[in-house]
Amino acid sequence: MIPIYDGHNDTLLNLPRTNRSFFEHGAEGHIDLPRARAGGLAGGFFAVFVPDPGTEPPPAPADGSGPAPELALIADRYRATATMPPPMTLDYAQRATLGFVASFYRLAAEANGTARVIRSAADIRRCLAEGVFAMHLHFEGAEAIDPEFDALEVYHQAGLRSLGIVWSRPNRFGHGVPFAFPSSPDVGPGLTDLGKELVRTCNRLRILIDLSHLNEAGFWDVAKLSSAPLVATHSNAHVLSPASRNLTDRQLDAIRESDGLVGLNFHVGFLRADGARDPETPISVMADHLDYLIARLGVDKVALGSDFDGATMPAALANAAGLPRLIDGLRGRGYDDATLRKLGTENWLRVLERTWGA
C-alpha cells in the first residue's frame, strides 16, 4: 500500500462536533485511526482552526459523507468581505487555540504509541518506518499570534511547525479569499506590515508558511519576502476549477520556481469546473487536477492535502479508508509506484526538510 502524508485535515475541530473517538472506526467524519490504517494514511498536518465566536455546532451528517454542516455554513458566511463577521479578539483566539492544542496533545497521549507528535522530517521518517501515525501541529490562520510574536515563539516550542497567515477572512496580518465561484483570488490588499514581519519571523523559526486561503496580493508579498519554498497545502488548479481558493497558473509557476509544493485539495467545490458541492464527483476529476499540477510544476512538487473532516469529499472516495481508490485511479492513468510514492510522502518530506531542516 502506498503510504500518504496528508497536507491538511480539520479533525481537531470535527472530533468534538461529531462526538466520536479518533481510535475507533466510525461512520461519521473522514479520519479515525482505523480508517487511516485501512487507507494507508500515515499522518499529516492537524489544523487548528478557530471558528467565529458564538457559532453553535450543529449535528453531523448521518452518513459521514461530509463535514459537520457548520463547516459549510462557515464558508457561506465568508462569500463576500462586506458580510464577514468582525475580526476576533486576540484573547478569544488564544483561549480557543490553547483548547485545540491541548486536544492535539491529548490525542497523542491517548494513542499508547500508535500515534506520535512529530517536530521534524526525521520524526516523520521514523514514524513511517515503525508504522506509527505521525501528527504535526498546524495553525490555519494566525489570529492567535500577538503583534510582538511572543506567542509564536511559545507555540513553536510547543510543536507548531506550519502556519497559514490567514483563513478566508482578514486579520491583523493579511487578507484571505472569500469563498466565491467563479472568482479570481486577486481580491483585496496584500500583507500588512505586521504580516510581512510574520513572514520573516516564520523564516527565522523555520515554520512553514501555508499559502492556501491567502489572497493573491498576499501570495506575492510572501513570494517576495520568504526565503523558504512556497507551499500551498490544500489548493487546486484555478484553470480547471475557477474557485477563489484555487491557484492561477502564474502562482503555480512561482511555486515551481521556489522549489515548493502544492497539496491537492479533495473538496468537490474546488475540483469541479462548475464549483458545485456535489459528492457524486468522480475520482477522475481529482486525477485531472493532479495531471495538470504535475505538468505545470513537475512530479516532485505535487502532493496531497485532502481537507478531510473540513470539506465535502467525492462519495467514491468518502474518507481516509478510500485513499486506495484514488491510488488505483492514478495507476489506471499510468502513474508508476515511484511517482505514487512521491505524491504520497516523498514530496512532502523533501519540502519539509528544506523548510524545517533535516
Predicted regions, residues:
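N-terminal hydrophobic targeting/anchoring segments and the immediately downstream early-domain regions
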Residues: 1-185, 242-304, 308-358
